Swiss-Prot record:
Beta-alanine binds at residue 61. Pfam families: Pantoate_ligase (PF02569). ATP binds at residues 30-37, 147-150, 176, 184-187. Its EC number is 6.3.2.1. This is Pantothenate synthetase.
Amino acid sequence: MLIIRNKQDLKEAILKQKQANKTIGYVPTMGFLHEGHMTLVSHARKETDFVVMSVFVNPTQFGPNEDFDAYPRDEAHDAKLAEEGGVDILFVPTVEEIYPTELATKLHVTKRVSVLDGADREGHFDGVVTVLTKLFHLVNPDNAYFGQKDAQQVAVVSGLVEDYFFPINLRIIATVREADGLAKSSRNVYLTEKERKEAPVIHEALLLGRELIESGETNEAKIVQVMTDKINEQPSHENIAYLALYSYPEFTPVTDWTKGIIIAAAVKYSKARLIDNELINVKRR
């Protein structure tokens, strides 16, 4: 595995693979890798000839009340997992490499962000599409791999790729879970022992919501209340940041229960905010 830190070296390495008619699979991450990330790598390994992973904690997607400096980082750990997983290039740029000067033009997401994390984290998805536009141009992948757990981000990135004609096939991979159903996340390390024991209730509640919808229930308030009651059976969380249903990928109110729907949850614990979701009537690409 080659570790690359600057743009020019990356572009030259990618060009060499393109000239050899190799397909490129790309897994963008913010590091602190876990099994969920490595599942994305596994799919990329199977479906493309050459796998690129980036590890970059992107400052433009952190809000004023979010601690960019406190985000967990462990490059040695990430490099070890990436190499073991079959990554060919690990791109680990500095902030200065990606943002050498103040941006003269800025991207602004106008749809799919007025609810959930988009509502709570103003400007967050603007930062996501900004950095991905830069990284997509540098890596020039055939396939890019994202996890379903970040479903709103996936919807936003899908819009970016469609709007700006990126010749990239987005591959959306099912959420990787612990044995008890908790979605794998870098933030799980912040849970106390009691919180970790109770956190799987988030997924249990989402499955209850799925079951109700698939059995024909269309009373949104009832569905949300059933899920809320389920989560509140385990009292270690501080609050439920959101628990909601929307059309997917539009993130508008549900009007047709036979089309794509997302049930999304965010639950705040003492030192971690966990998100999870279930997609209904949605085909992953």
